[in-house]
Amino acid sequence: MLGIVVSHADAASMHIGEHLRSLRDWETSVDETRPDDEGGGTVYQIDSVELREFEALHLDIENVAAAFDDPDLLVFASKHAGETDELLTAHHTGNFGVAEHGGEDGQFARACPGAHKAVVSALQRHAPPDYEVGMECTHHGPTAVGVPSMFVEVGSAEPQWEDPDAAEAAARAILDLADEPADRPRENGTRRHLLGVGGGHYAPRFERVVRETDWAVGHIAANWSLDALAEWADSDEERDTVLDRAFRASAADYALMEGDRPDLTAAIESLGYRVVSETFVQEATGVNLGLVEALEDAIRPVDEGLRFGALAPGYDGEWTVLDLPKELISDVRGVDSEALRDTIERQSIAYATEQNGTVVTGPIVCPATTELEAVVDPLVEILKQRFDSVERNADELVARETAFDPDLARTADIPEGPKFGKLASGESVEIDGEEIDPERFQRERIRRYTL
C-alpha cells in the first residue's frame, strides 16, 4: 500500500493534498486511535492508497509509517525551497553528517529506488510546460520512517507553491505510484540499485542514469555531503559505518562515483561493495546481472573493454566463447572497422574491445547453438572488399591478393619518391624514357587464418 503524508506546516504540501483529494473519489473514515495532529482524524483511502494529514513539519516526523495501515511505501508531499525557479523534484532523506534539519546524525531513511525512478518519469509526464524536473541528493530528515520513503516536491518559492498546475502535476505523479514497488526486482542476488557518490546537489549525472538506463539510484552523497561526513566522522571506521548504512538503506551493492576519489573507492570496496562506471551501467542495461557477472569473469570487466551485443538483452541460455584469430579480426578491421563492429554486435552476446571500447578485438561470446559459419561468413564478405579471393578450406581461411611489392621495385632501381608512390597505387610511370608498368612489381600475397 502507498501511504501519503501531508503536512499542515507546509503550504505546498497542503496544496498538493488538495489536488490529491480532488483527483480521486476517496473513501473517508475517522481514526480515533491517534490524535488528529498525528495522522488521526479523517483518513482518505482509495484502493491501495491511504492519505493522512499531520500538524508537524514532515521532516521532523519520526516513525510515521506506524500511523498507516501496513504501507509498503511512503511519499511526503512537500515544498522545495531554493534558487532553482520552477522545479518538480524527488529525493530520499538522511544525513551523511550532522542532522541540521531533522533526523539523526549519520543516519538514513530506507530509500525507495524503484519508486523514485518511477516518480521522476511521472513528474516528467505531468509537469507544466515551464517546469523542470530533477532529483536531489540525500538531505534532511526524517531518518526513521519505518518503510521505504521519499519526498516529492514543488519548488522553488511561494509563487510555485501556490501554482495549481504544479500541485496537480505532483499529485498525479504521486498517485501514479499506487502499486509501484519500492525496489527494482531482485536478480542474481542483488538489485539494479546504485549509491550515488559525489557531484552537485541536483545530481544531473545520476538523473541521466535514472532516465536513460534500467538502473535506479538510492541515496546520493553530493560533494557537500561528503564534506559534512568528513567533518562529522571522528575516524575512518566511523566514516565507513555511515557509508555502509547508506548502501544498506539503498538496498544497493553498487556505487556510481562522480570524480576520481581513490581513497573513497578503496573504502567502499573494503566494505564489500563495487564501484562501477557509467559505462558499466549503460552496458549492463537490459542484460541479466548474472550474465554480466559470468561474462566479466570469462572475458574481462566492462571497464576493461567488455561490450554487450544485440543478443544480450534478456538472454538466459547457454553460451560459448569464439576466439577467432587476431590476424583475421585485425585485417577485417583494416578493411572496414564499422562493418566489423556491426557484424560482431549483431551476432554476439558480448565481445572484447580495446582503447575505451572503440576497437573490436575479440574474443566473441555467442549462443551455444551458434554455428561458426554464421560468424565467419559475414567477415569473409568484408575481407573480399580487399582481397581478390577468400576461400574456406576445412578449418582455414585463405585470402589472396595481387599487390605492389615495394622490395621488388627497389631491386629494379626504382627511386623513392612520387613515381614510386604512383606505381604503388597502380599507375604507370616513365623513367629515363621508359614506361614502367606497375604489374612488373606485383606479387600474389596469401593470408591464412586458422579457425
From Swiss-Prot:
Reactions catalysed, as given in the entry: a D-aminoacyl-tRNA + H2O = a tRNA + a D-alpha-amino acid + H(+); glycyl-tRNA(Ala) + H2O = tRNA(Ala) + glycine + H(+)
Region (Disordered): 410-437
Gene3D superfamilies (alphabetical): AF0625-like
Entry note: cofactor: Binds 2 Zn(2+) ions per subunit.
Family per similarity comment: Belongs to the DtdA deacylase family.
Function recorded in the entry: D-aminoacyl-tRNA deacylase with broad substrate specificity. By recycling D-aminoacyl-tRNA to D-amino acids and free tRNA molecules, this enzyme counteracts the toxicity associated with the formation of D-aminoacyl-tRNA entities in vivo.
Quaternary organization: Monomer.
The protein's name: D-aminoacyl-tRNA deacylase
Originating species: Haloarcula marismortui (strain ATCC 43049 / DSM 3752 / JCM 8966 / VKM B-1809)
Organismal lineage: Archaea, Methanobacteriati, Methanobacteriota, Stenosarchaea group, Halobacteria
Gene that this polypeptide is encoded by: dtdA
